[in-house]
């Protein structure tokens, strides 16, 4: 299987998924009615109330710890890659 065959298969798959999404979304749109005719658009029970930072739940603490770990890993990886590039360039130089 050549590279062109894989490219054509991926393109066909992407186009098929796009057509499927476009046709499924078109069935949910009601073009004849407006928002005011559907009733009250805003519901007080669905509005966001925010997250308390001072008294946060265990899940949010774990989420932020994971976020810090991911950011630290990305920074360490980028520093390591940059350090390797500079040292490789430095050892190529002839004195």
Swiss-Prot record:
Residues 27-55 are virion surface. The chain crosses the membrane at residues 56-76. Residues 1-26 form the signal peptide. It is found in: Virion membrane; Host membrane; Host Golgi apparatus, Host trans-Golgi network. InterPro entries: GN_domain, HSV_GN. Interacts (via N-terminus) with gM (via N-terminus). The gM-gN heterodimer forms the gCII complex. Envelope glycoprotein necessary for proper maturation of gM and modulation of its membrane fusion activity. Also plays a critical role in virion morphogenesis. This is Envelope glycoprotein N.
């Amino acid at each position: 299987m050549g590279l062109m065959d894989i490219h054509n298969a991926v393109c066909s798959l992407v186009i098929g998924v796009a057509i499927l999404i476009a046709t499924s979304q078109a069935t949910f749109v009601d073009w004849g009615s407006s928002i005011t005719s559907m009733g009250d658009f805003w519901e007080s029970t669905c509005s966001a109330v925010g997250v308390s930072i001072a008294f946060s739940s265990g899940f949010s603490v774990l989420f932020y710890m994971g976020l810090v770990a991911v950011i630290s890993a990305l920074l360490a990886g980028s520093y390591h890659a940059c350090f390797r590039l500079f040292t490789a360039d430095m050892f190529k130089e002839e004195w």
